[in-house]
């Protein structure tokens, strides 16, 4: 949380100077602060559904910020690609959460970890959680959205997209090792 907060502060200060000549700054800063709130929420929650909500907040705000310069058609295309992939990933994450809550009637990561039985549905939920989060953090081979998004977004947005990607990586590791740690250690 401290690293994300300090990064957010630095990027916001940088964006004050970098974006000062642009129009529509109210929308830019509203989306930037939504992105910051989404990232801070993702790293601080211990609940799968709240993690999903914060992931979606950061995804939608990130897509809007990538397409912020609407006069650049490539930026709009990159923002649309980012939004489409984030939406497909969100559908998979929501399906995984539905599978887990349907089996165990719990959303808290610690409670789920104590109840997990590593059934076939649990393994399916693992895949449905891991793949979208790996895509969101830009892991190979699901990193195809990053070149367009990083090159067309304003530099302050690109910096914060990297922070957002690292928050998704943290969420991926937290879910993998908290929920599926015993299953992953058994496989080795």
Predicted feature locations:
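Hydrophobic cores of alpha-helical transmembrane segments in multi-pass inner/ER membrane proteins
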Residues: 2-9, 97, 126-133
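Short helix-boundary/re-entrant hairpin motifs in multi-pass inner-membrane proteins
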Residues: 78, 124-187
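Transmembrane helix-loop junctions and nearby membrane-interface residues
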Residues: 9-12, 16-19, 44-47, 97-104, ...
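Hydrophobic alpha-helical transmembrane segments in multi-pass integral membrane proteins
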Residues: 1-40, 171
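Alpha-helical transmembrane segments of multi-pass inner-membrane proteins
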Residues: 3, 81-86, 127, 161
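Alpha-helical multi-pass transmembrane bundles of energy-transducing inner-membrane proteins
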Residues: 27-124, 135
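C-terminal ends of transmembrane helices
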Residues: 9-21, 64-78, 136-151
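Alpha-helical transmembrane segments of multipass membrane proteins
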Residues: 13, 37-41, 64-65, 98-99, ...
């Amino acid at each position: 949380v401290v690293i994300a907060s300090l990064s957010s502060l630095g990027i916001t200060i940088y964006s004050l100077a970098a974006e000062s000549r642009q129009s529509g700054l109210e929308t830019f800063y509203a989306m930037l602060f939504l992105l910051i709130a989404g990232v801070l929420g993702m790293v601080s929650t211990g609940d799968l559904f709240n993690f999903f909500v914060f992931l979606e907040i950061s995804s939608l705000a990130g897509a809007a910020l990538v397409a912020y310069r609407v006069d650049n058609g490539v930026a709009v295309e990159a923002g649309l690609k980012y939004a489409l992939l984030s939406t497909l990933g969100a559908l998979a994450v929501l399906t995984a959460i539905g599978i887990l809550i349907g089996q165990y009637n719990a959303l808290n990561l610690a409670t789920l970890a104590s109840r997990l039985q590593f059934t076939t549905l649990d393994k399916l939920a693992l895949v449905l959680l891991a793949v979208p989060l790996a895509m969101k953090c830009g892991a190979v081979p699901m990193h195809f959205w990053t070149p367009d998004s990083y090159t067309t977004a304003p530099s302050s947005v690109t910096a914060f997209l990297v922070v957002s990607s690292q928050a998704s990586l943290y969420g991926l590791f937290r879910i993998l090792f908290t929920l599926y740690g015993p299953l992953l250690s058994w496989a080795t």
